[in-house]
């Protein structure tokens, strides 16, 4: 089903199911003999969502890489583990630079407010659909998990007036902020909503603020991309999952986030999928690996150095 303005979802359906898939990949990565990330909350969160394939993948009963490779997505676990590590390092660098305010947009099943070793005085805000925020905070509370920072979840759709909701939750725009947009600017918002999101981030960012994001689209307009999207949709359906890749993303030209930030005076550094995998200490991507949807995604870290 195609996306519509104002549509909603939970973690078992539509865009929400992709967040559960990513968490299952983090759980699988955590189980490896030499893991590059440790996310002890990924498996119980996936289990609580209740999608059978991802539950079994998170627990190690099913090889998620094997399943995904059959759908045209090579090295899925490496992809999402390396992405998580890339953004974890972004936060470590922000902390070292003295930043003590974080905003995670479209946080999904991201458990960074609980799993990262935040310093004293760190305020962490996370924004997502109200149902997603409620599910995650309730599930983690039942597990006995406590945030490792001063945690402020904000339940609101990014297509709504989230800046006002963020301020109402205590966000201080006068303080430098580390912003994370992981897995959201890759086609899951309409192009105009992407630039609106970035404009809001820029407006709310004091000098010294930082942003990290992945960007592009997982569903290109070429015949090859459309064929791969159809292959993945049919494959997920065969596993009992309704994840129509073409239907989950918005058509149109999506935002070059790095270029947009540079045009607004931010200093940027970019990387591609292969760079991020190599930086994580994993094997270099082969030509076949580069045919996966992740190969089209770029990464940026940026700093606002002037008004």
Swiss-Prot record:
InterPro entries: Ppm1/Ppm2/Tcmp, SAM-dependent_MTases_sf, SAM_mthyl_Trfase_ML2640-like. It is an enzyme of class 2 (transferase). It holds the Pfam family LCM. Its EC number is 2.1.1.-. The keyword S-adenosyl-L-methionine applies. The keyword Phosphoprotein does not apply. It comes from the Bacteria. Keywords: Methyltransferase, S-adenosyl-L-methionine, Transferase. One of its GO terms (molecular function) is methyltransferase activity. S-adenosyl-L-methionine binds at residues 128, 157-158. One of its GO terms (biological process) is methylation. Exhibits S-adenosyl-L-methionine-dependent methyltransferase activity. Belongs to the UPF0677 family. This is Putative S-adenosyl-L-methionine-dependent methyltransferase MMAR_4570. It comes from Mycobacterium marinum (strain ATCC BAA-535 / M).
